[in-house]
Amino acid sequence: MGYFESPAGHVVRTINEAWAFVPDPLPPTLTWTVGLINDLSAADRVLGELAGLGRNLVNPNLLIRPFMRREAVLSSRIEGTQATLTDLYVYEGEQLSLFEPPPDVQEVHNYVQALEYGLNRLQEFPLSLRLIREIHAHLMEGVRGEEMTPGEFRRRQNCIGPPGCSLGEATYVPPPVPHMHEALDAFERFLYDDAGLPPLVRLGLIHYQFEAIHPFLDGNGRIGRLLLTLLLCAWELLPEPLLYLSAYFEAHRRAYYEHLLAVSQEGAWEQWLRFFLRGVVEQSRDAMVRARRLQDLREGYREQLQVEQTGARLLQVVDLLFDQPLVTVTQVSEVLNVHFASANHYVQQLEEAGILREITGQARNRVYRADEVLAAIEGGGRG
C-alpha cells in the first residue's frame, strides 16, 4: 500500500491479514511555504468577496436553492450517478408521468434533503458525530446502498478500490472498526478546537480526515463534501450556503483523489491544501459570476414584464421559475393560490415573452421550461 512510512498515520492489520491505514489525529505539523500562504490569502480574499455579495442579496433564496441543487447533482455525479439538473427538477415537480428520469435521481434529491436538514439543525446544535449520522440517514433513505445501514457508522471493514476487489487489492483500506471509533472521537474534538489554524486550512484538513476515516459503508464522499458547506455556514465564513466545491472536484476528479491518497501515503499536506484552496478561489469566483447572472436575468424579466394590473402576480411566477425552472399550470395555480385559468394566462404571457417554452408538444398536461434560468444555474460560470 505504500503507507508504512507515512508521516500522516500508521498501518494496522485488519481482516484476512490485510493492512489498513489509521490517520493520526488532527492537526498535523504544517510547513507554511510561500506558496501555501499565497493560496490561503487568495482564498480568504475571494471568499470574503462572496460573503459580501451574500450579505447584500435582496432575495437570498433566488440563489440558495438553485446553487444547492446544482451541488447535489455534481457531488452525486462524482459517485457515479447520471441524473441531470433537469431530471432533479422533474422529480421534485412530480412530473414523472411525463418524463422518466434515471432511477438514481432520488439519490440526488436526497442530497438536497440532507443538506437542508443539516443547515436547519445547525441553527440549534453544533456539528457533531450525532448530527453527521442524522444527515447520513437522510442522504441514504430509500436508495441504492440503503442496506448499508443509513445513519449508522459501519460495523465492518470497508475499502476503496475497483468493484469486487479484495482488501489486498484495494487502493485504500480505512481504519478497522475499533480504530475508526477512536479516530472519529478525535475528529469530533477537532471540530470544536480551531488549534490556532486559519478556518479554510481547518476545512481542508477536516475534509481529508473524514475521507480517510471513511466511517460509513456508503455515502462517505457525499457526506464529506456536504460537511464543507455546513462548516462554512456554521463558522460564519458565509452568511448563506453559496460556495460548493463539487464542481471543482468533479472537473479535477483524478487530481482530487490523488491528492487525498498522497496525504495518507506521503503526508503531502501542502499539496492537498493548495489544491483545496485553489478550489475555494475558483468556485467562489464561479459563484459570484453565476449569482450576478441570475440576478441580472431576474431584473431583466421584471423590467420586461412590468404591467399595471397583473404585474405583481406575474412577477411572482418569475420568482417561482428561479426555484423551479420546469413548471406546469397546475403548479403555478397552487403556488400563487389562483384559479387554473388565471395561472394559465400568466404562463401564456411568459411563453409569449420568450421566458417559458412548452416542451412536451401535448395539448394537455403541458410542461414549461425556463431555458435561460436553467442555463444560468447549470452552465459554465465564467464570463
Question: What is each stretch, according to the model?
Answer:
Residues M1-G383:
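FIC/Doc superfamily catalytic core
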